[in-house]
From Swiss-Prot:
Molecular function GO terms recorded: ATP binding; serine-tRNA ligase activity
Function: Catalyzes the attachment of serine to tRNA(Ser). Is also able to aminoacylate tRNA(Sec) with serine, to form the misacylated tRNA L-seryl-tRNA(Sec), which will be further converted into selenocysteinyl-tRNA(Sec).
HAMAP family assigned to the protein according to its UniProt record, in alphabetical order: Ser_tRNA_synth_type1 (MF_00176)
InterPro entries linked: aa-tRNA-synt_IIb, aa-tRNA-synth_II, aa-tRNA-synth_II/BPL/LPL, Ser-tRNA-ligase_type_1, Ser-tRNA-synth_1_N, SerRS_1_N_sf, SerRS_core, tRNA-bd_arm
Annotated ATP binding sites: R283, K284, E285, V299, E370, M371, V372, S373
Native species: Sulfurisphaera tokodaii (strain DSM 16993 / JCM 10545 / NBRC 100140 / 7)
Reaction catalyzed: tRNA(Ser) + L-serine + ATP = L-seryl-tRNA(Ser) + AMP + diphosphate + H(+); tRNA(Sec) + L-serine + ATP = L-seryl-tRNA(Sec) + AMP + diphosphate + H(+)
Cellular component aspect of the GO annotation: cytoplasm
Family statement: Belongs to the class-II aminoacyl-tRNA synthetase family. Type-1 seryl-tRNA synthetase subfamily.
Name under which the protein is recorded: Serine--tRNA ligase
UniProt: L-serine binding residues: T252, A253, E254, E306, T405
Pathway it works in: Aminoacyl-tRNA biosynthesis; selenocysteinyl-tRNA(Sec) biosynthesis; L-seryl-tRNA(Sec) from L-serine and tRNA(Sec): step 1/1
Gene: serS
Domain notes per entry: Consists of two distinct domains, a catalytic core and a N-terminal extension that is involved in tRNA binding.
Subunit structure as annotated in this protein's UniProt entry: Homodimer. The tRNA molecule binds across the dimer.
Length: 453
């Protein structure tokens, strides 16, 4: 939940219901939250009244006449017992209320397109020259949704990234990985590993040159923390839990960076605080049983560079645009054609009030595929983690948190394999990566060539 949500529960529950309806989920939790919050505030008044009465009587005992003292002591004990019982009742109501509130998603920004799923998301801009196989032109044009873009027709069918990796280049092995680890794992070799490393260094270099602080975060978080950063009920099919430990593997560096100021206060003049984290990402992908079974697009582990900002409330929307521009700059540097879409309300996830996705065109699949997710979470995470800003005069409020992918290495590799392949199976390396490969004598510099048996 967020402070914004708690304010709406108390002052405008109908508005909160409207936001939740936009997400196409049940609004009955709002009524229960309103009921419990009213009960909590009423009980709090009763606690404060009992506490006041107890304090008045307790302070009068030393001054009382001897014949009155015993009666006052008895009355004080009765009030103390009643107070303790009422405080316990208050705690129980508060816990029940907070459990309900923690299940409520973020509010929704008015600029997010309303719709139950991703088909209602709206493309807002395109970039690059798109390679389109001649038989896929009609399908490509249908995905533009009326927008005009620059594209070229190619007359040979591109090879899908999974076959390029394992059958043409012979630089990956998902079959052996499945044998020893299970589905959605992989071995990568030689040039593809160098490409992975170069992509990570390119993203880090780009972001640190903009003044973002580089972070290597913990790869596991305690239950209390991960439940504050995300809606764990929504993510239970995505997050790995360590058996017999109160620890969860992170699904992105967003999670530990968000927790960097867990239960702390930040001087407002220090905001915004901008970070770029690098980490492995671990995902169960339990909800994607039949999606992307081949290749390395949707896997249980990969490397990721993540942007993250702690912001003052008044600056968060401006910084949301900054984050997506940073991601676009990275993909423009790679020369990968893409579109940015404004995500529909039903596909936002609990944390985000608004989200952009950057999707690269994949010529072999004739589809746009997600490479970047960029969210403004307002104060939803900060309230749950108790991260506040403090003004010089002492006034406090909850910070806003924002996050965006910079690079998810394996997905970006799949985009390079499909967009930079030649008809003879050779893959050109994006020129921007050359400087990150040149220091290593065995690393490829310009091309990745198919391996012979």
């Amino acid at each position: 939940m967020s402070w914004s949500i708690l304010e709406l529960v108390r002052n405008n529950p109908d508005k909160l219901k409207e936001y939740i309806k936009r997400r196409f989920i049940d609004v009955s939790l709002v009524d229960r939250a309103v009921e419990l919050d009213k009960k909590w505030r009423q009980t709090l008044q009763e606690v404060e009244k009992l506490r006041h009465e107890h304090n008045v009587i307790s302070s009068s005992i030393p001054k009382a006449k001897p014949e009155e003292r015993q009666e006052l002591i008895k009355k004080a004990k009765e009030l103390l017992k009643a107070l303790e019982e009422k405080e316990k009742e208050l705690d129980n109501i508060e816990n029940e209320r907070d459990n309900i509130l923690m299940q409520l998603p973020n509010i929704v920004d008015d600029s997010a397109p309303i719709g139950p799923d991703e088909t209602y998301s709206v493309p807002i801009r395109f970039w690059g020259k798109f390679k389109v196989y001649e038989k896929d032109e009609a399908e490509f044009l249908s995905q533009l949704k009326g927008n005009r873009v620059d594209y070229e027709i190619i007359h040979w069918k591109p090879v899908g990234h999974a076959d390029m990796l394992e059958n043409v280049l012979k630089l990956g092995d998902t079959k052996k990985a499945a044998e020893v680890s299970g589905a959605r794992f992989y071995y990568l070799f030689d040039d593809i590993v160098w490409l992975d490393i170069a992509l990570l260094n390119y993203a880090i270099d780009t972001m640190t040159s903009k003044g973002y602080t580089l972070v290597l975060p913990p790869y596991m978080l305690r239950g209390e923390v991960i439940k504050s950063v995300i809606d764990l009920d929504t993510f239970k099919d995505a997050i790995y839990k360590i058996e017999n430990e109160d620890l969860y593997l992170i699904a992105t560096a967003e999670h530990p960076i968000a927790a960097l100021y867990f239960k702390e206060e930040i001087p407002k003049e220090k905001l915004p605080l901008k970070y770029v984290g690098i980490s492995p990402a671990f995902r169960k992908e339990a909800g994607a049983a039949n999606k992307d079974l081949k290749g390395i697009f949707r896997v249980h582990q990969f490397h990721k560079v993540e942007q993250f900002i702690f912001s003052s409330p008044e600056d968060s929307w401006k910084l949301h645009e900054e984050l997506i521009r940073n991601a676009e700059e990275i993909f423009q540097g790679l020369g990968l054609p893409y579109r940015v879409i404004n995500i529909a309300t039903g596909d936002l996830g609990a944390c985000a009030a608004k989200k952009y996705d950057l999707e690269v065109w994949m010529p072999a699949q004739a589809k746009f595929r997600e490479m970047v997710s960029c969210s403004n979470c307002l104060d939803w995470q900060a309230y749950r983690m108790r991260i506040r800003y403090v003004e010089k005069g002492g006034k406090k409020g909850y910070v806003h948190t924002l996050n965006s992918t910079a690079i998810a290495s394996t997905r970006t590799i799949t985009a390079i394999l499909e967009n930079y392949q030649r008809e003879d199976g050779v893959v050109e390396i994006p020129k921007v990566l050359k400087k990150y490969l040149e220091p290593f004598s065995r690393a490829p510099k310009d091309y990745i060539y198919p391996r012979k048996e």
